[in-house]
């Protein structure tokens, strides 16, 4: 069972809160609740961030396109959170400028300027510059007829690491985090919940009592509630799939593009992992198991068609190096198009008189996870009659206790001059000040141990097994890092054999 707890922590016989789901919302609630003194147990049926939370567009943003649907409250709330998250996690969240090529037949310039003015002013903005108009010169990667555009600010995030670092923060406050652990049954016993958990690697089952239950199962929220908890969801849900592709880098520069399309949708093109471009997303109604969600050929062609309509360089399906799809469970607000469905969240409370409460989390954006978690924890503390004060707005995530990324990189270079520049930059952007913990005792590159390919060494593999709930190569290659884009199949096979031994040793040490 993937279980990492704070040093010296003893399991509680009755937890205040059992959280089902190890995505960003579940981990956010675990962090906030544990930090307020509640005893927290979180279970995740797979790896942390294994589904929707690692399959986003990887943006911390207000959502410029939501202004067209008059979702001003959502945009303002998200823009305010953008400022907080940039401050709390500067290692994994960084400013990103977006260029919006002007296509006069799609939206007039006055409409775009008005939207950007609102975007600049719906919430207080300190960390990022405002919007401006652009003239696109002959060096632009866009087609020659696109000569005008606009530029504005948002932020990029390593979404999976955001989840994992939030889980680490929760564990540091006493939360118990169990991965590869499914909730296979839960029922009320008066003012308590009794839940049966199953370790998916060993088949072992255990019973746990809690005073409250949080269903943060993401796209499985309704299935879990109906088939495992045997309660009805009070709000109709809509599953919407968003897909992305990764291609070789389309253009130099650290800015992104937001492309308008004839169907009134937009598509992002975002610099990704130095050598690649991330293109997305789609909005498609989805039915079936969210775990099986994958991009369709039609979605791939759609994304490439939008890009090819704007860029000089033309892409083919053979250029796609990687693709992924995530499914969101949104509260169904009866909008006809999936793109128009609100991304705002709903906290659904179920508490029959005299019985233990349950909160189900519906919808939400990765940008507003901290605010969602704060509101959910406010509810939990009220239900459990625990005095509490919100605290996470001023709390740096693990590794984020520094002000300037450039200064941190320079400091790390002085301390570890033997570290290759590419590896130092990756450690800086992935671990921040936790790099010191990762490299403790290392004096040379040889001290990092076995080399598995790209810039992956045994020292990092062991660190992630011990500190970040890594059990399978996929956890490491696609969520804790994106080195899956760089390691060859033979190298992955060697890594798998090594990790199989090391994870078994680690499990034996913790049993």
Predicted regions and their residues:
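Short hydrophobic core segments
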Residues: 20, 208-218
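Extreme N-terminal leader/targeting segments of oxidoreductases
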Residues: 1-17, 32-36
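Glycine-rich FAD pyrophosphate-binding loop
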Residues: 34-54
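Flavin (primarily FAD) binding-site architecture
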Residues: 215-230
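Helical element adjacent to the flavin cofactor pocket in flavoenzyme catalytic cores
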Residues: 150-207, 211
């Amino acid at each position: 069972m993937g279980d990492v707890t704070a040093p010296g922590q003893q399991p509680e016989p009755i937890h205040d809160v059992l959280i089902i789901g190890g995505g960003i919302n579940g981990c956010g609630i675990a962090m906030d609740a544990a930090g307020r003194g509640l005893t927290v147990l979180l279970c995740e049926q797979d790896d942390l961030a294994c589904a929707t939370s690692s399959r986003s567009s990887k943006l911390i943003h207000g959502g410029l396109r939501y202004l067209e649907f008059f979702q001003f409250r959502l945009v303002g709330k998200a823009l305010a959170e953008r400022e907080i998250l940039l401050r709390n996690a500067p290692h994994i969240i960084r400013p990103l400028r977006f260029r919006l090529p002007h296509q006069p037949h799609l939206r007039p310039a006055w409409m775009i300027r008005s939207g950007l003015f609102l975007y600049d002013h719906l919430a207080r903005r300190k960390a990022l510059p405002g919007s401006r108009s652009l003239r696109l010169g002959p060096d632009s990667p866009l087609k020659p007829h696109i000569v005008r555009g606009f530029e504005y600010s948002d932020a990029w995030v390593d979404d999976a690491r955001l989840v994992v670092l939030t889980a680490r923060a929760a564990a540091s406050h006493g939360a118990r985090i169990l991965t590869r652990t499914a909730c296979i049954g839960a029922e009320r016993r008066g003012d308590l919940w009794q839940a049966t958990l199953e370790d998916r690697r060993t088949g072992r089952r255990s019973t746990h009592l809690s005073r409250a239950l949080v269903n943060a199962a993401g796209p499985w929220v309704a299935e879990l509630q109906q088939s495992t908890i045997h309660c009805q969801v009070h709000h109709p849900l809509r599953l919407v799939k968003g897909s992305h592709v990764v291609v070789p880098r389309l253009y130099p520069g650290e800015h992104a593009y937001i492309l308008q399309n004839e169907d009134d949708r937009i598509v992002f093109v975002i610099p990704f992992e130095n050598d690649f471009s991330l293109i997305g997303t789609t909005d498609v109604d989805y039915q079936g198991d969210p775990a099986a969600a994958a991009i369709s050929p039609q979605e791939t062609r759609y994304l490439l068609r939008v890009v090819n309509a704007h860029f000089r360089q033309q892409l083919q399906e053979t250029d796609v190096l990687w693709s992924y799809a995530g499914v969101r469970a949104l509260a169904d607000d009866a909008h006809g198009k999936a793109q128009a469905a609100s991304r705002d969240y709903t906290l659904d409370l179920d508490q029959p008189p005299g019985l233990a409460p349950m909160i189900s989390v519906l919808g939400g954006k990765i940008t507003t996870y901290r605010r969602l978690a704060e509101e959910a924890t406010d509810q939990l503390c009220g239900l459990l009659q625990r005095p509490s004060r919100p605290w996470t707005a001023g709390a740096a995530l693990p590794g984020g206790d520094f002000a300037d990324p450039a200064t941190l990189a320079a400091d790390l270079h002085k301390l570890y001059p033997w570290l290759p520049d590419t590896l130092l930059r990756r450690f800086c952007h992935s671990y921040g000040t936790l790099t010191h913990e990762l490299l403790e005792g290392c004096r040379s590159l040889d001290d990092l141990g076995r080399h598995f390919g790209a810039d992956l060494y045994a020292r990092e593999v062991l660190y992630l097994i011990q500190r970040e709930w890594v059990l399978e190569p996929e956890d490491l290659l696609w969520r804790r890092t994106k080195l899956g884009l760089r390691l060859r199949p033979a190298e992955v096979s060697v890594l798998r054999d090594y990790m199989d031994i090391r994870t078994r040793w680690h499990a034996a040490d913790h049993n």
